[in-house]
Amino acid sequence: MSLSVEAKAKIVSEFGRDAKDTGSSEVQIALLTAQINHLQTHFATHKKDHHGRRGLLRMVSRRRKLLDYLKRTDLAKYSETIARLGLRR
């Protein structure tokens, strides 16, 4: 259910400051968003996967906390990140 190495590398290069920047908030938010989108398609077909749904809710909560941190520290990057990812806020 995780993302492929190529997909992660593409996201890191797109949102990171350089090719090895995996720790910045923008990259972490983008990776979590990709995983969440992937899992949403999984739950469309596997409606009774309650254990997996708990993991999805943890990811959503973690993304929410990272977005709150980014908004608190750098409002311009926050606005740019949610616009590029198409998140509503």
From Swiss-Prot:
Keywords: Ribonucleoprotein, Ribosomal protein, RNA-binding, rRNA-binding. It comes from the Bacteria. GO terms for molecular function: rRNA binding; structural constituent of ribosome. SMART domains: Ribosomal_S15. One of its GO terms (cellular component) is cytosolic small ribosomal subunit. Gene3D superfamilies: 6.10.250.3130, S15/NS1, RNA-binding (1.10.287.10). One of its GO terms (biological process) is translation. Part of the 30S ribosomal subunit. Forms a bridge to the 50S subunit in the 70S ribosome, contacting the 23S rRNA. Belongs to the universal ribosomal protein uS15 family. One of the primary rRNA binding proteins, it binds directly to 16S rRNA where it helps nucleate assembly of the platform of the 30S subunit by binding and bridging several RNA helices of the 16S rRNA. Forms an intersubunit bridge (bridge B4) with the 23S rRNA of the 50S subunit in the ribosome. This is Small ribosomal subunit protein uS15. It comes from Haemophilus ducreyi (strain 35000HP / ATCC 700724).
